[in-house]
Amino acid sequence: MGEKLAIVSPKVQTTRHRIKGILTEKNYQIIFSDTPGIIEPKYKLHEKMMQAVKSALEDADLALLIVDVKENWEECDAIFSALKLRVPAIVIINKIDLSDKIKTEAAIAYFTARPYCKKAVTLSALTGINKTKFINALLEFLPEGAPFFDGDDISDLNTRFFVSELIREKIYQLAQDEIPYHTAVIIREYQEKSTLVKIVADIVVHRETQKAILIGDKGSMIKRLGMLARKDIEDFIQHKVFLELFVKVKPKWRENELYLREYGY
């Protein structure tokens, strides 16, 4: 697609929504659904996330099961087997740029032998190694049909959503421990002016102590967070941005159905 549509972070459970990415070329259109990772729900937010996974699997023509070539394959196999997929699945063995040929070939052999795996494909999402082979493998299993989206579309979600995700990404990068998992970002204002785009956003946390940490000493943390987020937002929308951030406390918002609806879950 040529755009970053999801948060990039070494922390787990960063994706909370089902995000569709649309790849349109001359002879095909592929709609990718990025979903939250599969977890045992502990609160209502987790339940919403797992509903997004279930919905994506029910709608899909093909499941892409992504595994890091250096991960524990047996653990991945257990997770993939538990999905009880009703559609064909391709196992994507990622990060081959960090592996040797012997390890990569062993991974291919291991997953090809699994009953849910119709094909195993190697890829480096970072460097683009085997990108064409990856796309061709998908086309083998996808049905023919008319395009669902216009050729210029790259996602079914709006700009405000991606702006909120870019802000949330910076929280994952800068904040420690449980704080990223206790935050939500809500865009309160998105106004296009003649010379810039004005964006006002709330960062919602559970506790006053978390608010104090995100604001930082004399506002140092929120200033840095805003500066980094603004740069990425400007790169994304290709326009100068004025970004204003507020930190608000909403105790146990992850368990509150009304808050979850308001925040887009």
What is each of the regions a protein language model found here?
Residues 87-90, 96-161:
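Canonical P-loop GTPase G-domain recognition
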Residues 15-16, 22:
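Conserved P-loop/Walker A NTP-binding site and adjacent catalytic elements of P-loop NTPases
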